[in-house]
Amino acid sequence: MALVPPLGREFPPEPVNCPLAAPRELDVVGGTICPAPEEETSRPEQVQASLGLPEHCMGELKSTESATSPSRLPLASSHEHQDGGKPCEHSDSGLEVLEAEQDSLHLCLLRLNFRLQDLERGLGSWTLAHNRIVQMQALQAELRGAAERVDALLAFGEGLAERSEPRAWASLEQVLRALGTHRDTIFQRLWQLQAQLISYSLVLEKANLLDQDLEVEGDSDGPAAGGVWGPWAPSTFPTPAELEWDPAGDVGGLGPSGQKISRIPGAPCELCGYRGPQSSGQGLEDLLSLGLGHRKHLAAHHRRRLRKPQDRKRQVSPSLPDAMLEVDRGVPAPASKRPLTLFFLLLFLLLVGATLLLPLSGVSCCSHARLARTPYLVLSYVNGLPPI
């Protein structure tokens, strides 16, 4: 059985559109895989006939297979009874069917790999990208069918391994694991190509729509049949006679016929006596607007009441930025602040004079204190003066 060639190899650009191999009927309970009656064992010569690949591509494929393919699974030599040495016919037939299914799946995945490389080669216009998305969806459906066959083959191989020798199962497990890895790699590449094609088709679709808009604008730039401004058509806008008078845009209190409209003053406020805006009082809208204005005025009073404690706190201890904001440059300083500045100036001069006069008056005091504190001895004789 041939392992998968490296995914990074380049193959000729001929498209491969051959149908998938016929799926096999799995009989896991009986321990065998029954091939379809019309199906035969796939071989490298059948690859060239089914895929339609050129001879140099098949040469590369054969060289790759000879370099990377493991040896065939041992049939009669490794599956013998330990007591009598007779080969187990049931196990041998299961391994033969498993090997044939493995070859068929390898060819199927190889064909899907070629088709995926065909789709990955290059992207052209938006139409080509859209067609490739359709081809990719068909390829994805075929790959799902192949993945189901691989899963069934793995399940059958696990059941067969329970009745075979450990050495034979080791080689079988290695081959089946390679098939699963190849399947996962193709799925991953297919998902990457799907995301690339979708993003590319969206970009090309936007560019195509932009080109169509530019073509339409370019066609409409030239003068029409009726001249530069086009053919004349009756306007759908209303004439001045059909326009209605809007009281919101009235200036001077005049109605639609130029007559003076009598205005009704609004209700006075219970707190400050303010009267709201005047209205004609002829419709329901005027009454509603008066009531709404009165409610807004009362809400403003309520907000002022809530703000008064905060304003008092700010007036008691104003911060430096607030005091700076309150000063107006164009207005001179009030006269009440001048005595305060004079008082601070006199206080400063008084302190300076006191500091100058204190050292002069403190010289004598310090001298008396020093004399009083100077220690001296007083000698007193009890029996008189000593003899000379």
From Swiss-Prot:
Residues 331-388 form the KASH domain. Residues 1-339 are cytoplasmic. SUPFAM superfamilies: Spectrin repeat (SSF46966). Residues 361-388 are perinuclear space. PROSITE patterns: KASH (PS51049). It is found in: Nucleus outer membrane. Disruption phenotype: Mice are born at the expected Mendelian rate and look overtly normal. In the cochlea, outer hair cells form, but appear to degenerate as hearing matures. Inner hair cells remain intact. Hearing loss is already detected at P15 and progresses at all frequencies by P60. GO terms for biological process: establishment of epithelial cell apical/basal polarity. It is a single-pass type IV membrane protein. The disulfid bond with SUN1 or SUN2 is required for stability of the respective LINC complex under tensile forces. Residues 78-92 have a biased composition (Basic and acidic residues). The chain crosses the membrane at residues 340-360. GO terms for cellular component: meiotic nuclear membrane microtubule tethering complex; nuclear outer membrane. Keywords: Disulfide bond, Membrane, Nucleus, Transmembrane, Transmembrane helix. Residues 60-92 are annotated as: Disordered. Its main location: nucleus. It comes from the Eukaryota. Pfam families: KASH. Expressed in secretory epithelial cells, such as those found in exocrine pancreas, bulbourethral gland, mammary gland and salivary gland (at protein level). Also expressed in the cochlea, where it is restricted primarily to the 3 rows of outer hair cells and 1 row of inner hair cells (at protein level). Not detected in other cells of the cochlea, including Deiter's cells and pillar cells, nor in liver and kidney (at protein level). The KASH domain, which contains a transmembrane domain, mediates the nuclear envelope targeting and is involved in the binding to SUN1 and SUN2 through recognition of their SUN domains. Core component of LINC complexes which are composed of inner nuclear membrane SUN domain-containing proteins coupled to outer nuclear membrane KASH domain-containing nesprins. SUN and KASH domain-containing proteins seem to bind each other promiscuously; however, differentially expression of LINC complex constituents can give rise to specific assemblies. Probably part of a SUN1-containing LINC complex. Interacts with kinesins KIF5B and KLC1. PANTHER family: NESPRIN-4 (PTHR21640:SF1), PTHR21640. As a component of the LINC (LInker of Nucleoskeleton and Cytoskeleton) complex, involved in the connection between the nuclear lamina and the cytoskeleton. The nucleocytoplasmic interactions established by the LINC complex play an important role in the transmission of mechanical forces across the nuclear envelope and in nuclear movement and positioning. Behaves as a kinesin cargo, providing a functional binding site for kinesin-1 at the nuclear envelope. Belongs to the nesprin family. This is Nesprin-4. It comes from Mus musculus. The gene is Syne4.
